[in-house]
Amino acid sequence: MIRQAVIMAGGLGSRFGGRTKDMPKGFIEIDGIAMVERSVQKLIAAGVEEIIIGTGHCYEYYDGLAEKYHCIRTVRNENYQNTSSMGTLEVCAPFVKDTAILLESDLLYDSIGLFALDNDSRKNVILASGKTNSEDEVYLETDENGVLSGVSKNKAEIKNVAGELVGISKVSKEFLNKMVDFYDKTRAENAKIDYETVFKKIAKDDPIYVHKIEYYAWTEIDDEAMLTRANTLIYPRIKENEELRKVQREVLLNPGPSTTTDSVKYAQVVKDICPRELEFGNLMEKVSEDLTSFVANPEKYTTVMFGCSGTGADEAMISSCVPPDGKLLVVDNGSYGARLAKIASVYGIETDVFKSSTYEPIDLEALENQMKSKKYTTFAVVYHETTTGLLNPLEKICPMAKKYGMTTVCDIVSAYAGMPIDMEKLQIDFGAATSNKHIGGMAGIGFVVCKKEELLKQKDWPMRNYYLNLFDQYKYFEETKQTRFTPPVQTFYALRQAIIETKQETIEKRFERFTECWKILVNALKEIGLKMLVKEENQSHFITAILIPETPAYDFNKMHDFARGQGFTIYPGKLGNIDTFRIANMGDIKPEEMRRFTGILKEYMKSIGVC
């Protein structure tokens, strides 16, 4: 698993003439996307967390790209006109922490090459292809062990061609440091040396291997002829290859698990690893830190993770966060609030339930009267009641609970990573969530974001639950970077990728996307003549509960099958004697997909005489 990449992008691109006078050649577009941006997208999809771009000519373009992709760090090679790729790599090297992917900026390539390098067990590896006939080949020679022994554009200088240099490599931090040391010592005579030539120099003492993909689809683009070749010959091959690896798209409009990106799905395809290895412990530690940082200050809060569903996280929270002699007050204004109360009853926790309408706002005055009527130690509420899409005003409710001395435990399962949340500002002490809703991971990891001060109070409390005990899990993880019991390994890799993609989009922009999808749906419902259960001003923008049409011709199963046949999954919903169906805006749903769905919905409703 490689966390960093370095793109060497300092060159002038002079072989393009006027085209690159005022623009780096990495910004030449193929099918509407700049080469370097396409590369950035592929690196993110491959799980790279930070991309360092060494810039020079027209560096402002790359600085602008960094504003769009938050994982990019630009480093300027001030002397780019008098150096070559090694000079640019030198200025980037101090920011490389571990093994990194090195790339040139003017490459068009099949993303499978990144997968091949990541899955090569050797520390230092050069990606090579078979014969390309590009007329700008860099030939590689290897010894009997596959170690690089020669690099040249002159084929006559190579005894046996092992492959052609692609311009994508994997190097360790130690190998990179040796490259920089060599360059520093020989700068006077080697100012314009290329990085691949330095590979050969270092390989004499520290091996770098060649990984050849015979029929690999790629090209470097250095001039107009290469650009024409890329557009007509290479890009169509790359596009076809990558299209073949796409997973069939099913848009889940159910309230979780949500639609995931292909990169999240593929993130599960990793080498087998014992979860007790330090490497995996480090991954879980980083995931925990990132999950915390989305909603709270990691210095004051921490995230405790379990192999379980969101309900498992709720159970961990309820069973762990009420003191032995404590009393719990639960708000029930939907199925998920009722579930919190049910969990408490199973554990024999003394509990009062504040019943509220499932589709109208909570009566805050009545709730406060309930809070002050008895001495409660703990208060539990659902932020986004997924049954209906009703958003409870935690910004008012939790401070009210704190006023009466209660610890606040909140189900934030269907709000986490879908909307901006500041747990400290909202005065939430514990928040339960899951890997398979707005965060965009796969089902299987439940977690509780905990205020450390409150969590530490549980140290000497008797355990009501063994597997789901918050403090025991927290303590063990702090000491070992391990969960007490076997974690869902592949699901953690998928969650790591989902976190990378959440950081890139940002939660604020994600909420905007969900809101746009919600508006498209609401406008379509009005046009069709269908009514929503919850008033618009009280909706979360994540779930819309829709009253079923008053006609005997309506059949949810037939509507479901009609939508499913066109790639959309919908979900029923029933509240007592109120019949509804629900449409969710979660996960990797796009506005254009919601438009397509509303067209399908209109078509079905028209077929039964509703519109």
Regions found by a protein language model. Name each.
Residues M1-I7, R15, I33-A100:
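Conserved N-terminal catalytic core of the sugar/cofactor nucleotidyltransferase
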